[in-house]
Swiss-Prot record:
The keyword Hydrolase applies. Belongs to the Ap4A hydrolase family. Gene3D superfamilies: 3.60.21.10. This is Bis(5'-nucleosyl)-tetraphosphatase, symmetrical. The lineage of its organism: Bacteria, Pseudomonadati, Pseudomonadota, Betaproteobacteria, Burkholderiales. InterPro entries: ApaH (IPR004617), Calcineurin-like_PHP_ApaH (IPR004843), Metallo-depent_PP-like (IPR029052). It comes from Burkholderia pseudomallei (strain K96243).
Length: 282
């Protein structure tokens, strides 16, 4: 991993093509040129300017650390012919762009997890049996598979809900699928780590027998700060070792960024309103 400065990184929540809100937030923050910029996934889709958003993040070069979210992977799957565009998708402009191939390649080479300064960033979450080392090992397996020449076949095999819980005995596609779903889809799980994929409300709406993944008893990543997005109904949430960043910009709420100081008490939140996102073209 690359360290550009001793400055704490700034982590952004799900942009989802909300380019105007991102520009406003970036300009408000006015980060120094060497400040690392982290993005918790879902750079694109549903917002009105997915193409402009993606191009801008790509242009940041190695300064930008962006993990893969479910909408970013949906873009790859549509580009690969594995899935089709759905109502509400706004990624068609990326697929039709003259630089589409370069943009797709950039997305395909993003990581599923990033660990630095004692902080682990993923898009959605982690299973309770994983410590940081195992999470990074699984992320690396997924990353290498998606960067291989047969990545389309691999991506096709990753979609599905089963198995829905971790076992060290899992192999091949089953092992990768569980990791894929935890990194990019999880919100709720049982205390034993069995994932549930239908519920998308806040913690109070947890199905019977389930709880937010980060509250699973004995979670082995409780000793690091986990930074994640994905869960708009949860909203911005900061605990000593937890930073939830998706505050529902694409739904007309707010876009959030957090300056990730090593001391939790020194972490600074900056937000902008997102009234225009999803309502009209920029």
């Amino acid at each position: 991993m690359t360290n550009f400065s001793s400055s704490p990184p700034i982590a952004f929540g799900d942009l989802q093509g909300c380019h105007a809100a991102y520009r406003q937030l970036f300009d408000t923050l006015a980060p120094a040129a060497d400040t690392p910029l982290w993005f918790a996934g879902d750079l694109v889709n549903r917002g009105p300017a997915s193409l402009a958003t993606l191009r801008e993040i790509v242009a940041l070069g190695e300064r930008a650390i962006a993990v893969l979210g479910n909408h970013d992977l949906h873009l790859l799957a549509v580009a690969a012919g594995i899935r089709t565009l759905k109502p509400g998708d706004t990624i068609g402009e990326i697929l039709d762009a003259p630089d589409a191939d370069d943009l797709i390649e950039w997305v395909r080479h993003r990581p599923f997890a990033h660990f630095e300064r004692g902080m682990l960033m993923v898009h959605a979450g982690l299973l309770p049996q994983w410590d940081a080392a195992l999470a990074l090992e699984l992320a690396d397996e997924l990353q290498r598979a998606l960067r291989a020449p047969n990545w389309r076949d691999t991506l096709r095999s990753l979609y599905g809900n089963d198995p829905n819980c971790w076992s060290p005995d899992l192999k091949h596609a089953d092992r990768l699928r569980v990791a894929f779903n935890a990194f990019t889809r999880i919100r709720f799980c049982t205390p034993e780590g069995a994932m549930e994929f239908r519920a998308n409300g806040g913690p109070a709406a947890a199905p019977a027998g389930y709880l937010p993944w980060f509250d699973a008893p004995g979670r082995k990543t409780a000793d690091v700060t986990v930074v994640f997005g994905h869960w708009a109904a949860l909203g911005l949430m900061l605990r000593e070792n937890l930073v939830a960043l998706d505050s529902g910009c694409v739904w007309g709420n707010r876009l959030s960024a957090v300056r990730l100081a090593d001391d939790p008490a020194a972490r600074v939140v900056t937000q902008v309103a997102c009234e225009r996102c999803g309502a009209a073209d920029e």
